Amino acid sequence: MAEVTNIGLEVFGDMGKFKLWLYTPNFALGNLKPIDLLRDSYGKEMVIGELTRINYGILL
């Protein structure tokens, strides 16, 4: 979770904005909440991938 938090803070620049993103269903993640995907390593990688895409301006 620390890795995801660090990336999220880098992308959003604010813990409040990052938490809002974590708890909001995400179209690119199958309309799942990113927080719900952090239960296993596969989901964690999906969330990190989406944060990376957001950071580079690749939005779906």
Show the residue positions of the predicted features:
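Non-transmembrane "mature" sequence context
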Residues: M1-L60
